[in-house]
From Swiss-Prot:
Gene Ontology CC annotations of this record: cytoplasm
Domain of life: Bacteria
Record protein name field: UPF0235 protein Sputcn32_2690
HAMAP family: UPF0235
Family classification: Belongs to the UPF0235 family.
Length: 96
């Protein structure tokens, strides 16, 4: 499966998370996943909450439209974004 897949108006992202980074950003491809750096530490779900908030802002959707489908406790995650209003250029160039 590729890093970014469009499915019935939603986006499925296969991401690799880098917690405790110096800034929040979508880095680019990391193998067959999209690498996302976030500033939050991987403690008590803080990284997941921060990731959801960051992706919601990047894709211009409410936080409730960002779902972590797989990988709740690991760095490799699958995320569904429901009908994104905006697709960042780092992601749109990876769309099939």
């Amino acid at each position: 499966m590729s890093a970014v897949v469009q499915q019935q108006g939603d986006l499925l992202l296969n991401v690799y998370i880098q917690p405790k980074a110096s800034r929040d950003q979508i880095v680019g491809l990391h193998g067959d996943e999209l690498k996302v750096a976030i500033t939050a530490p991987p403690i008590d779900g803080k990284a997941n909450a921060h990731l959801s908030k960051y992706l919601a802002k990047a894709f211009k959707v409410p936080k409730s439209d960002v779902y972590i489908i797989k990988g709740e406790l690991g760095r490799h995650k699958q995320i569904r974004i429901v009908t994104p209003k905006l697709i960042p250029p780092e992601v749109s160039e990876l769309l099939e």
